[in-house]
């Protein structure tokens, strides 16, 4: 089973330090996703400081839209294949900082696919997508751009 969704986008927990640098697209109690200069990173709260998460065996393969692609529909299906050495615990997709309503599944708890589409049509031009996945101890996030 793949757990999809992280909760609300950019949800900040009170009393905790802020992840970064960059734009926080997701912040839970122990895990966060940040984008800075077009590069996404998963972060883990260790003590009272956010640190880059260990990727370990967590892998993400972008299925669509293809990185750098042009002429995509204005409501594109965004999808990623996920895998890890341990059970996947959480995953999510964003476009332009807005979390998608994801669906997904897999044949094992360590491999799966998530996909979703923006709730409203995207404007013509370039957009940034982010995919995120984590296990209990490792996490990874990847960003890519595509054009409508």
Residue ranges and their predicted role:
Residues 79-148:
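Long, low-complexity serine/threonine/glycine- and acidic-rich segments characteristic of extracellular
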Residues 14-37:
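Post-signal peptide N-terminal segment of mature Sec-exported envelope proteins
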Residues 22, 55-56, 67-70, 88, ...:
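Glycine-centered loop/turn motifs
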Residues 26-27, 35-36, 46, 95, ...:
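Structural motif
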Residues 3-5:
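C-terminal motif of bacterial Sec signal peptides marking the signal peptidase cleavage site
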Residues 30-32, 50, 99-100, 139:
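Short, solvent-exposed loop/turn motifs
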Residues 7-9:
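Bacterial signal peptide processing site
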Residues 35-38, 44-74:
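Short, compositionally biased P/S/T/A/G/V-rich stretches that sit at domain boundaries
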């Amino acid at each position: 089973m793949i757990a999809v969704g992280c909760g609300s986008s950019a949800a900040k927990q009170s009393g905790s330090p802020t992840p970064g640098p960059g734009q926080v697209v997701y912040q839970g109690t122990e895990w966060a996703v940040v984008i800075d200069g077009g590069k996404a990173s998963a972060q883990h709260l260790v003590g009272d400081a956010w640190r880059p998460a260990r990727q370990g065996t967590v892998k993400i393969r972008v299925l669509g839209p293809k990185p750098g692609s042009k002429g995509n529909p204005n409501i594109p299906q965004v999808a990623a294949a996920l895998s890890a050495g341990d059970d996947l615990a959480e995953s999510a997709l964003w476009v332009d900082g807005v979390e998608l309503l994801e669906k997904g599944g897999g044949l094992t708890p360590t491999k799966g696919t998530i996909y979703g589409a923006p709730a409203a049509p995207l404007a013509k031009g370039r957009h940034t997508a982010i995919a995120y996945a984590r296990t209990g101890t490792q996490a990874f996030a990847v960003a890519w751009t595509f054009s409508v």
